[in-house]
Amino acid sequence: MLAGLAGALAAAAPAFAQERAGEPAADGNIVVTGRPEAPPTAREITRQARSITAQSGLRESPLPRFEDRLCPGIIGMKADYASLMIDRIRANAERLDMWLTEDDGRCTPNFIVAFVRDGQAELAALEDEKGYLFRSLPLHERRELLAEDGPVRVWTTTQTKTRDGIPVQRGQGGNPPTASMWMAHSKIYVGTREDIVSVVVLFDMADAQGKTLLQLADYATMRGLARTRPTEDGQALDSILALFDADGSPPLQMTDFDRAYLAAVYDDIPNIPGITKVQGVNRQLRLQAQAEAGAPATRE
């Protein structure tokens, strides 16, 4: 199903010609290749996972994630293309064993992908007219969102809850109370979790031109299902977060690293310190490799 869906999405937007591997050079010259690069180390993978995580205080705070049913919706795109993007986002969520609404078009979207002429102007106008919608954002996040001048803006609303799902009110300073405790398996858990209530991913239409529906859906998935950010520094592993990099060739879809990152975020219970999730990307990559090789998964 996933392979067929990926093919349909790729066919619905610009395609890129590729040379066939192994085809001899036209002039018959001998091609000399160097030694393959060594695979990235566990430390490099963890460093990359940390760099794309849009959050500080990872040793004390959990990473935000969806705990309620997910309902993706698209604004500003033709219905048939929007349907393909929604199918892809839902398929990505299914791979993470996320809780999804029925795919009948009747749910109220809590994951909105919108294509607009000027995302910064849209948000500024919305703040002027309905500023109360931004009250749940800490002041520094609100300022960063409204000042963002890149091709994509991500507006994530979260709710701090106890580990059992009871809402926790923020203090006067905007920071939720935190607590640590010992639980089973000799792991340290935190007393609260951070639930994503809703996400709006705004693409500037001019910058989205030339990208495939598959790339756009996977980029939105990577930015919306977790609080991530693109980085300008060179990375050890490819990522769909490089989709709008001015230099280089972005991947055609989510990479193994991307899937491992999201799998780590949605692995186990939600009230685990973020640093544990970040370090878990290495484990998820190993599990992926074992699955591709047909080897039985080993307990770690």
Say what each PLM segment does.
Residues 1-5:
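Bacterial N-terminal signal peptides that target proteins for export
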Residues 12-14:
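N-terminal signal peptide c-region/cleavage motif recognized by signal peptidases
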Residues 27-38:
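N-terminal secretion/transport leader regions
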Residues 28-30, 62-77:
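Acidic/histidine-rich, surface-exposed loop or edge segments in extracytoplasmic proteins
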Residues 39-66:
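Compositionally biased P/S/T/G-rich terminal and signal peptide-adjacent segments
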Residues 42, 46-49, 82-90:
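Extracytoplasmic/secreted envelope proteins and their assembly/folding machinery
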Residues 73-88, 97-300:
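Long, folded non-catalytic interaction modules
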